[in-house]
Structures are given as structure tokens and as C-alpha cells.
Amino acid sequence: MAKEWAATANQNGYANCYELECTDLKILDLNAEQFCILHWLTILLQNREFDTPSGLAYEAKAYLIENFKVDYSTYDAIIGYRADDSYFSFAQDFINGTISYRQLNNAMHLGKLGQQFVLKSRKAFSLIKFTGYELAEHTEWFDKKNKRDKSARREYFSTERNKRQRGDIYITQIMDEEMKSDDARLR
């Protein structure tokens, strides 16, 4: 996916190649069993600008930060969903009450948008080794990026956003019932 992000509509790019020995790193894996999608969303809310135009979105953001906050300050790296525009829009819809928790979970797998490995400590950066680079030709990779993103959004709008299911849990219910990360319904 690095090549998809490297190339622009009219210009080639480069994808750098690295090696990283992770043995001595403390890694937060947001895909681990003790976490749910709301932990990832909370980290996203803390680190990206989120438009919270409605009272619901503002309240949802505050609730998630209070109840699903992960102390990642001592970690060297974090593994989790990519925070690209597609995922960001799915998360925005969830805190605005447009989609359910189930729909958010499903949306995160549309278009195979992938995971990211984020280095965040000096220790992690000191262990990374540059091994080379690969050309990302814009004629191939920019098109792939657009197709992947459009595919995810098309799947989202044609299936997930329009299909409410009986028993779906929305952010309002999570807040009203004061659900926490150990709630079985969020697993």
C-alpha cells in the first residue's frame, strides 16, 4: 500500500523499504483480544481533527475518550487500522449516530484498506534500518489507490450504511447504558 500512497495522479513516487527488529519493542496491538474497535476509534479521536458539529458527536467523543482511552504513552509502536480518509469517514458516521457498532466493525474490513504499524518512540526509530526503495509508477499505483478507496466507499454506501439490523447498537445506546470495554456486546 505504500506505493499507492507514494504516487500522485501525475507523478511517480517511491516506497521506502525498511527492516525492524521488534523483539525488544513494547508493541500495542489494537487487534488483540482485550481491545475492541472503540479503543482504536478513541486513539483516532485523540490524535486527528474530528468535526463534531452535533451535540451527539461532541458527547460521543467525550464518552469514548473517558471510557475507552488506552494509555499508549509507554509503547514503542502501535498496530491498528489505518487512519485514512475512508476509515475516518466510517468513524465519523459512527460518532454521529449514522451507523451502528456492527456496521462500523464491518466497514473497517471493506476494500481491504489494511493495518498500519506506527513507530512512536526514539527506541523504535533507532532500530529501523533503511534497506532500499521501490519505484511507484503513477500510471499503476495511483489508479490502484483510487480503486481501493472507491471500492470500500461503494461497498459501504451500498451495503453497510443502508442496512440496519434488529438489535444493532448505536453510540447513543453505548452512552445511555454506560457500556465499557468489557461489555460482551462490544466483542
Regions found by a protein language model. Name each.
Residues E19-R187:
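Active-site and NAD+-binding cores of ADP-ribose-processing enzymes
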Residues A2-Q11:
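Short active-site loop/helix that positions an aromatic residue
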Residues G13-E19:
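A glycine-rich, hydrophobic loop/mini-helix early in the fold
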